[in-house]
Amino acid sequence: MLLILANWLEHYFDVFRVFHYLTLRGILGILTALVISFIVGPPMIRYLGSYKIGQTIRDDGPQSHLSKAGTPTMGGALILVTITVSTLLWSDLGNRYVWAVLLVTLAYGLIGFVDDYKKLVLKNSKGLAARYKYLWQSVFGLGAALFLYHTASSPQETQFIVPFFKQVVLNMGWLYVPLVYFVVVGSSNAVNLTDGLDGLAILPTVLVAGGLAIFAYASGHSEFSEYLGIPYLPKAGELVVFCGALVGAGLGFLWFNTYPAQVFMGDIGALALGAALGMVAVLVRQEIVLMIMGGIFVMETVSVMLQVLSFKLTGRRIFRMAPIHHHFELKGWPEPRVIVRFWIISVILVLIGLATLKLR
């Protein structure tokens, strides 16, 4: 939006040409999202608290969590508002990548909102039935996949990139559609499973978004992409602005979500953020890198799958409780220790993911 204004003003004032630089707009996206979070966050938290939109706690969970009951949730709405406003202000609104990732993020946020609203406002303990939740996730995920497949303007947009190896690419053809579907839906649910402790999911999300922003910038630059051996995707660079908005919104939310949390994001935030990461990863053709950088999300998801499978086959549980962060709590780890150690692991994994740019 402001880029359109800058394009007009540059005809009269040369200084406005600086807004063509992605790095500047990415930084402004971060700062704008942060400022909005700090301004809107406190009144939104008070509003959620005044309407008793508070978190419910599992009786069979760690006893330390009982004190969290009633903490305002659905704070993911703050994240979505800040991402949307910042992205619309600083991105090129003629870029289909920007609209694709933003609309999918909001669509998954809508699914999460309905689930949270049913549980917290209508007091329906089951929320949105699982079959309907996965149905709508599938509808939006498949819709995004078909849109990207049919609007792809070059073979590079639908290739599967194998990191650590030079020039190892697979032309996916129509298999690109199920790939995008599984990455977006899987990433959405993985982040949702991770969102069980104060700040546990949001900082890894911020770190992964920052890492993907670097891939987006390199992919959108012909010289960098050729030098690094990654596909050249002219439209991908604009995703730097979206990722910047996500980073700023995430850091702004963490200000209120850090231990002890003043607000939780709820499904409205977790489902949306996971879908956003999945969309950016498929748009810059780095699905495997997403699994590396988002290894915390993968670990949490696998722990749930193993727990369910083991219990169904043997009647025994592998972990004291799943997802695995609860296992460590029940082993006696204080919640802040679990959170910070998972954060440290996430930093390491993001660095490994970034290393794939050169280790080929």
UniProtKB/Swiss-Prot annotation:
Record flagged with keyword Transferase: yes
Pathway linked to the protein: Cell wall biogenesis; peptidoglycan biosynthesis
Pfam families listed in its UniProt record: Glycos_transf_4, MraY_sig1
Lineage top rank: taxon: Bacteria
GO annotations of cellular component type: plasma membrane
CDD domains named in the record: GT_MraY
EC number: 2.7.8.13
Ranges annotated as spanning the membrane: 21-41, 70-90, 97-117, 134-154, 168-188, 199-219, 236-256, 263-283, 288-308, 338-358
Enzyme class: transferase
Membrane topology: Multi-pass membrane protein
Principal subcellular localisation of the protein: membrane
GO MF annotation, one: UDP-N-acetylmuramoyl-L-alanyl-D-glutamyl-meso-2,6-diaminopimelyl-D-alanyl-D-alanine:undecaprenyl-phosphate transferase activity
Protein localization: Cell inner membrane
InterPro entries xref list: Glycosyl_transferase_4 (IPR000715), PNAcMuramoyl-5peptid_Trfase (IPR003524), PNAcMuramoyl-5peptid_Trfase_CS (IPR018480)
Annotated keywords: Cell cycle, Cell division, Cell inner membrane, Cell membrane, Cell shape, Cell wall biogenesis/degradation, Magnesium, Membrane, Metal-binding, Peptidoglycan synthesis, Transferase, Transmembrane, Transmembrane helix
Catalysed reaction equations from the record: UDP-N-acetyl-alpha-D-muramoyl-L-alanyl-gamma-D-glutamyl-meso-2,6-diaminopimeloyl-D-alanyl-D-alanine + di-trans,octa-cis-undecaprenyl phosphate = di-trans,octa-cis-undecaprenyl diphospho-N-acetyl-alpha-D-muramoyl-L-alanyl-D-glutamyl-meso-2,6-diaminopimeloyl-D-alanyl-D-alanine + UMP
A Gene Ontology biological process term: cell division
Role according to the record: Catalyzes the initial step of the lipid cycle reactions in the biosynthesis of the cell wall peptidoglycan: transfers peptidoglycan precursor phospho-MurNAc-pentapeptide from UDP-MurNAc-pentapeptide onto the lipid carrier undecaprenyl phosphate, yielding undecaprenyl-pyrophosphoryl-MurNAc-pentapeptide, known as lipid I.
Descriptive protein name: Phospho-N-acetylmuramoyl-pentapeptide-transferase
Gene this protein is translated from: mraY
